[in-house]
């Protein structure tokens, strides 16, 4: 039966839906490469990499995995393409939405989480270094943000105060940012001029099998936490040495709890397992938090 459910699950994954609100219309989309230096389960140094899209409208910025950006443009849903974002623990960040707040959506087995925090004034210190990044003349600045020192470049040629993740607040688009230890790096690799809606999902509707093996729709709500509480939870669970050997050690076994595991293929043909759209990490790397507090 498990094998049958797995085959059907791949077919219905494409029909996953979200309750979406359009919160603005962005005229540009900035594309960044995010790299994270970490170690695998054997202690070998590795560098994980993924693309991030950033949109902006009327003071709102949305930073989210590029695969999700592509899905929103093309339609449909392929949860397996979200594996890299799940492995790197990169969620969807809404800066100044609601006004004066930062809202983040992130998946961490077995739930989807929504976190909330105040949008603090970011006190950048302008520095003297200059460079040309992605074809844009860039000036430099540094900041201590949530316990991490960031060194960044920005361009006044693109007069929007946005950047990847929660970074922003400079007099121009951030073109490069790295933390003082060189663990995390964001590099601008493209800028797309387009009119696209900025979408905020209130919840997700997924298709799951009932006790008879028939697939039925199910509303999946976000577990709501404060950003500081969720960060503490991630540091405790993902920072445990057991995580890289058994990535779901802190939660009930998927089959024992849900009675099924979905298996689908990403665009590269790799097989990825998930439960109700939440990716199961099969090749975890050591957790490297982007912020310490």
What are these regions (language model features)?
Residues 1-25:
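Bacterial Sec-dependent N-terminal signal peptides
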Residues 128-133, 137-194:
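Glycine- and acidic-residue-rich phosphate-binding/metal-coordinating active-site segment common to enzymes
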Residues 19-123, 127-130, 137, 151, ...:
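Extracellular or lumenal secretory-pathway regions
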């Amino acid at each position: 039966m498990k094998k049958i459910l797995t085959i059907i699950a791949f077919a219905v994954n494409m029909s996953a839906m979200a309750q979406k609100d359009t919160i603005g219309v962005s005229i540009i989309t900035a594309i960044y490469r995010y790299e994270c230096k970490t170690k695998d389960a054997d202690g070998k140094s590795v560098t994980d990499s993924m693309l991030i899209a950033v949109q902006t409208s009327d003071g709102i910025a949305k930073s989210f995995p590029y695969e999700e950006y592509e899905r929103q443009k093309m339609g449909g849903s392929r949860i397996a393409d979200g594996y890299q974002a799940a492995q790197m623990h990169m969620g969807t960040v809404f800066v100044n939405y609601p006004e004066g707040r930062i809202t983040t959506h992130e998946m961490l087995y077995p739930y989807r989480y929504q976190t909330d925090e105040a949008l603090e004034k970011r006190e950048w210190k302008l520095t003297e270094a200059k460079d040309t990044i992605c074809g844009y003349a860039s000036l430099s600045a540094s900041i201590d943000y949530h316990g991490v020192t960031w060194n960044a470049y920005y361009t006044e040629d693109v007069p929007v105060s946005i950047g990847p993740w929660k970074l922003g607040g400079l007099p121009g688009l951030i073109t490069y940012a790295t933390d003082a230890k060189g663990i995390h790096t964001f590099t601008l690799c493209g800028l797309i001029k387009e009119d696209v809606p900025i979408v905020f999902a209130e919840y997700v509707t997924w298709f799951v099998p009932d006790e008879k093996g028939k697939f039925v729709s199910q509303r999946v709500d976000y577990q709501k936490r404060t950003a500081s509480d969720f960060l503490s939870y991630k540091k405790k669970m993902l920072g445990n040495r057991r995580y890289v050997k058994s990535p779901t050690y802190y939660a009930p076994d998927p089959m024992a709890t849900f009675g099924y595991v979905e298996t689908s293929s990403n665009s590269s043909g790799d097989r990825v397992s998930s439960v109700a759209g939440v990716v199961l990490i099969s090749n975890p790397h050591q957790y490297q938090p982007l912020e310490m507090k």
